[in-house]
Amino acid sequence: MLFYMFIFYILYFIFYIYNIQNININMRTDDDDHDDNDDMDCAAAFSTYFDRLKKHSRGSGSGSGSGMMSANLKSMYRNWFQQLREADAFLHASPSFISAIVPDIIPTRGNRAALPRPAMIERDKMPFMTSEITDYLQKTEVTHWLKYAASNIRGRSVIVHILHCGGGGGGGSSSSSSISSSISSSISSVSLKRLKMYRSYVYKIYAWFHFIHPYQQQTQQTQQTQQTQTNKENECSKEINLYFYFTPFKKLLPRAPGKTLGPAHANTGFTYPCGMNPGPGGKKSTEIIIFRHEEWFKVLMHETFHNLELDFNTESRTSLRDVFPAIRHDVLMSEAYVETWARILNVAFYVFYDIYGGNGTAAQYNTAVARCLPVERAFSLFQSVKTLKYMGLTFSDIVNPDPAVSSAAARKYAEDTNIFAYYVLAGMLVFNADEFLQWCVSKNAISLMQATHGQRGTSLFKQFISSLCKNERMLANIKLFETFEAPEHMHSTMRMTAWS
């Protein structure tokens, strides 16, 4: 029996070695369960729509009307291309590279006790997960727990947990089944095609944590200098556990008008800032949970910004009533900030890995970014306009200072999660990506991506957002989106990125 187990593992290992030298990070598989074709259809539909819009746009310069990128944006993306190449080289040169992308596979069919129990779920009872998603996770059998671990990505341990839902098949296996057949069943139930897909995901995750490290490392060093602290125990998320529940649920507008937009329509993941983590791991050992397959990588980047405290690092909300008189509730500014960064960076990773599989040249990368980023910027503004339209509002309604207009608009606006930050503010910011990056260069004293913490940071950000409300190019494009009919495929989606 031990001999057969040994032979099986050798064959399994050879499968990975055979593919290792030419890892293709392209996530476009034939996987019907996750239906990546829907993502491609969305991007293709909007891209075609965008081309039509350009003929009618009144924008100029680097706006969506011309589809051009500024020199600053081009320079930023060129720098990120070099960082992604460095991440690629680091991962391939790492002595533990092979073991880091070969998972431990734990069979869990018929044994819920064998599943991992993230501390956040135990403590917070799955925040932001709708009953539809929690019911799905309760009723759909998780057949395998795949655990990947990279112990040293620039000093950080990154542990990836993928909860795999297999195909049908019932009944528990007989207790007399041999160990070798049990292992063989485990591997075959998680198809090699799916294992290859998961491996590409994990590789991209590792590259992300290599990429983001310098920005957060500068934060730690600066804070330690300011506080005269060099104690390694204070380091943020030295170990981070990432839990992926790849449920098939899409973010969609309600079919019937009048329903308040909430977690079912917008949320995909959650975490705590490392310094506020109430779990047993404290600041050093933290968690991020992703509970949809849709836009999972963009959401990981969003949650990482929160987790590593690259945002304003405050739960205090900000009143925007003097900028948007119709918005009477206070807003979490960090949500708009990190969502904007996640969408901008998502384009860099999408082009590098999903289009070219990590093998594109600088020229190919720059050309693809020049095509993808303008579409992303326009899509963000389109989603902003569409979200307000669902509530019977226009952008001019929410910025109009007239008391009668703002009061009428305030009665129409309703949310049960951070809709305004995710869609309206982030839509404005991504559309004005060049201005946003210039603002980060001038106002973020620690690093490009590290926001100034606390009220000072949110006040500066509020001033910047207020200035964007007067941007004529953006206002002209908002009017265009309000009047130009979109393809039917785009009417209901609440996804936040065109490319994923």
Name what the model sees in each region.
Residues M1-N19:
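Hydrophobic alpha-helical signal peptides and transmembrane signal-/tail-anchor segments
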Residues D30, D38-G59, G65-E141, R154, ...:
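Long, compositionally biased intrinsically disordered regions
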Residues F97, I101-G168, S188-T219, N231-G281, ...:
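Auxiliary, metal-adjacent structural segments of Zn-dependent hydrolase domains
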Residues Y203-P214, A336-V351, K386, A414-Q438:
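Short, hydrophobic/amphipathic alpha-helical patches that form generic packing surfaces
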Residues K283-L300:
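Short pre-active-site segment immediately N-terminal to the catalytic Zn-binding motif
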Residues K298-D311, A342:
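Active-site recognition of the HExxH zinc-binding catalytic motif
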Residues F312-S380:
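Post-HExxH zinc-binding segment in Zn-dependent metallohydrolases
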